[in-house]
Amino acid sequence: MARSLQVAVQMDPIDSINIDGDSTFALMLEAQSRGHTLWHYEVRHMALKEGVSRVTGGKREERLFARGHSVKVVRRHGAHFEFGPMETRDLGGMDVVLMRQDPPFDMAYITATHMLEHIQPGTLIVNDPAAVRNAPEKILVTHFPDLMPPTLITWDVEAIRAFRAEYKDIIVKPLYGNGGAGVFRIKPDDENLASLLEMHFARSREPLMIQRYEAAVRQGDKRIILVDGEPLGAINRVPAAGEARSNMHVGGRPERSPLTARDLEICAAIGPALRDQGLIFVGIDVIGDYLTEINVTSPTGLQEIARFDGVHIEKAIWDRIEEKVAPIG
């Protein structure tokens, strides 16, 4: 039996989660059932303290602290968690940190990954912060061009117009968004592309991702969960009527979805790279025969897969975490 672990959960406010769908909640319940101790904090309460660090062998070490609470969780609507008193703890004293806050993948997010690196390798961070920083979901996928639909990432309006002229029906996405926010389908006869681009670039200095629209999305956008590079389950997310986006955040309907031969081919192609980078918990998105995104920040879908297939992937995730912590401890 694995020893009891001290587990810090870096996430958004726990009082706002949907306990019937939140994957972080499923991970916390599973950790608690194994006898691990949970501690909750938000990114905004982290502090990297220079000059107050302990001295070991004459070498000054920066220490990463956070203000947070010990927490117990229970599957009970309206009262799903119980906090201990607010306290400050040294995150370097934790066995595991689950990095589970949602994007946007902005400079605040990137800064948090840099701060977390100060407690490695003594603390296992899931997913590895440097790997997450180097693998934004909509960019990591471009390292597998043979698996993805025609795609353009650019600031150049003329390049976007040329891409549309070639492929006619396109999807326009903010590069660092999540949950389907800001995603538009521009049909061949749509006259709003110029206005959309003007609005985006007036507000943001970030490039856009443009992809060929895949009609197969009407049959669903499949989310496949990989644990340490191995596919363990999937759900299909079907767009609502009149909606181009299939994300569950915007009304996509989850349904059972077995893994196909093409799904397994995609997973076999990307799995070793994910494992080598320390990306233990990953969710990929597949439309038809194409890989469209690789989600490494805070993947979701665990509870939906459990409901449809009876497969509790959170157990496999904790099996792998415990295996990886053992040599550290």
Regions found by a protein language model. Name each.
Residues 2-5, 10-12, 16-20, 244, ...:
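ATP-dependent carboxylate activation and anion-phosphoryl transfer catalytic cores
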